[in-house]
From Swiss-Prot:
This is Metalnikowin-3. Signal peptide: none annotated. Keywords: Antibiotic, Antimicrobial, Immunity, Innate immunity. Induction: By bacterial infection. Antibacterial peptide active against Gram-negative bacteria. It comes from the Eukaryota. One of its GO terms (biological process) is innate immune response. One of its GO terms (cellular component) is extracellular region. The keyword Transmembrane helix does not apply. It comes from Palomena prasina (Green shield bug). The keyword Aminoacyl-tRNA synthetase does not apply.
Length: 16
């Protein structure tokens, strides 16, 4: 079974 090609979404940076 081939795993789905998911993209590593950028981590939400806190706006300080």
């Amino acid at each position: 079974v081939d795993k789905p090609d998911y993209r590593p979404r950028p981590w939400p940076r806190p706006n300080m």
